[in-house]
UniProtKB/Swiss-Prot annotation:
Gene: Fam216a
Pfam family for this entry, one: FAM216B
Protein name per Swiss-Prot or TrEMBL: Protein FAM216A
Family, similarity comment: Belongs to the FAM216 family.
Protein source organism: Mus musculus (Mouse)
Recorded coiled-coil stretches: none
InterPro entries linked to this entry: FAM216 (IPR029373)
Region (Disordered), start-end ranges: 1-41
Length: 251
């Protein structure tokens, strides 16, 4: 069958159809692939936009909201709020400044804050509200507590019993050399010195501490015991002098 279009090997419709189909079939996957990538990119951008919006909302939710300033009715007729060009926000700002500058309002705020701290502290253990009362009660208990008085009484009884049961330790603790004008002599401390010493007991130790004159006068029994111990010690000891600069002690 002779062709109607010379120079064409095959039917042009078929070739065009095949070429069209081939070109269409070749270009269709490219268009679908590009469209899919574009949709994917759009979805990613939309997701980023949504996540950014959610993060912004969360940040705004976490931040503290500024309290709205309400203009009281008593200040609506104030001269500084009657300016026609003032906006509502400017009027609220001026109202807040006027409240801050007002001394009575400051006193009210201070009183409210004080009452809040007072009630908040009273709910605890009473450290803020009754601090002075606790301190005074502790001081009075320390001064007049029966346990403290009983402990002092036991310490005094222990000191007296130790003084009566161990005279040798007391004698040796009271004995010390004295220097006179004539030369070196061996003897005991003066009577006033012995009176000003008081015996205290600690676990495993016995030592002397100076006591004021009032305390020594208020305890005549201890003084008499010390004097008796000194007399006994002096009776049991004799001093022999050998020359002006030598002395020996015999018991």
């Amino acid at each position: 069958m002779p062709s109607r279009w010379p120079g064409v090997a095959g039917p042009p419709a078929l070739a065009r159809t095949e070429g069209g189909e081939g070109s269409a079939g070749h270009s269709y996957p490219q268009n679908s692939k590009g469209t899919g990538e574009q949709h994917k990119a759009d979805r990613i951008k939309e997701g980023h936009r949504v996540y950014a919006h959610i993060a912004k909302l969360q940040e705004l939710w976490k931040t503290t909201q500024i309290q709205t300033i309400h203009i009281p009715k008593s200040m609506t007729d104030a001269s500084f709020l009657k300016h026609p060009e003032l906006t509502l926000g400017q009027k609220r700002y001026l109202c807040s400044v006027a409240k801050i500058c007002n001394s009575s309002y400051l006193r009210t705020l201070m009183k409210r804050q004080y009452m809040h701290i007072f009630h908040h502290g009273s709910q605890k253990t009473g450290v803020l509200t009754h601090h002075r009362g606790h301190m005074s009660s502790r001081y009075s208990q320390k001064q007049h507590s029966p346990c403290t008085a009983w402990r002092h009484h036991l310490e005094r009884e222990d000191s007296l019993s130790i003084a009566a049961g161990a005279p040798e330790m007391i004698i040796h603790s009271l004995w010390r050399p004295l220097r006179h004008k004539e030369g070196l002599k061996i003897g005991y401390a003066s009577k006033t010195r012995c009176k000003s010493l008081k015996i205290f007991r600690r676990p495993g130790r016995l030592f002397l501490l100076p006591v004021p004159s009032n305390d020594s006068q208020s305890c005549p029994s201890e003084e008499t015991q010390e004097e008796d111990l000194l007399n006994k010690c002096m009776q049991s000891m004799s001093i022999q002098e050998q020359g002006p600069a030598h002395a020996s002690l015999t018991v």
